[in-house]
Amino acid sequence: MNIVLRWLLTAIHSLLKLNWLVRRPRTFGAHALALTPEGKAILVRLRYARGWRLPGGGHGEHEDPRDAVLRELREEIGMTAHGEVQLAGEIEETPDFKRDLASLFVVRDVRYRPRRWSWEVEAIIEAPLDALPPGLSPRAERWLDAVKGKL
């Protein structure tokens, strides 16, 4: 079932990318370098995309990015508590043909309880910042480089 679900979600994502190629929409994202109380980074692997990523996602134009990143952390990793939330920067990118403004946050002292199963998130790991796992997505690598100076 996992293989079929991955294939289906990947196909849907590919159709969305085709739509974005034509429309070139303006989108907004909020993503977090979520750190456990021990200082480990929390990374997610999505069912429809390759590589380990920073948790986060899209939000509406009028939604506060800080609220959005906290919502995404609750949805993706099951965050139950957190400490300081710091805006680390904003990055303009063109992922999948979209014009995206990504707000990057550092969220400290994150406590979470992963859901047993999720449509979107296939796996969650914790890793020390100086020993991140192989297979980081290129976007996660860029964002981590941008955020490391804010730690």
Residue ranges and their predicted role:
Residues 1-31:
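Acidic, metal-coordinating catalytic segment for phosphate/diphosphate chemistry
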Residues 80-90:
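A short coil-to-beta-strand element that immediately follows conserved catalytic motifs
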Residues 34, 104-108, 128:
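Short, well-ordered beta-strand micro-motif
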Residues 90-114, 147-148:
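Active-site-adjacent beta-strand/loop module that shapes the phosphate/pyrophosphate-binding cleft
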Residues 50-51, 117-151:
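Nudix hydrolase/Nudix homology domain
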Residues 36-76:
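Conserved Nudix-box catalytic region and its N-terminal flanking loop in Nudix hydrolases
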